[in-house]
Amino acid sequence: MNHFQRNRFLFHLLYLMAPRVSEVSSHSMNSFRLYRGQWWWFVLGKGEKQGKIPASDEMLGALMQYREHLGLTPLPPEDDHSPLLRSISGGKGISANMVYRQVKTVVKEAAESIKLDNPIQASILEKASTHWFRHTSVTHGDDAGIDLKYLTRSARHEKIETTAIYQHAEDDLWHKAWQKLKF
């Protein structure tokens, strides 16, 4: 296995599923399951709380490509208890710390590649982390018009108020309106 394929899957997972880093490292392939004719990611998260998140076609495509690269069937059977993210050297899983370090390495390289042309974006990107992708996923979900109750369930937040923190559309409108004020 090479880093590219694992990283491609990892970044799809981080952005499209909004997981906590511990969820990324602790789950097996069969946590992606067909339920009532649709694919979901079944998660045991913070506080041992069970949750499920819809797996979009894009997420399934990334999962299938990653699994095929590993020499596995495109979609995981129920008995596939192998780690969701594998070490480069074989079938063992990787730790939450390794997931975090891998993300930091990739975003640092990406930031470095745009630094000359776009130093402000580079400095923002350099600060990205696994949790940043979780926040970004929920924020972009809100921007895309996904209902707050679905965002709350996908983020596995106890309270809808926690998820509401990620709603920035009002700030954007306010900022745009404020531009009308001229000296």
Show the residue positions of the predicted features.
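Conserved catalytic core of the tyrosine transesterase superfamily
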Residues: M1-F183
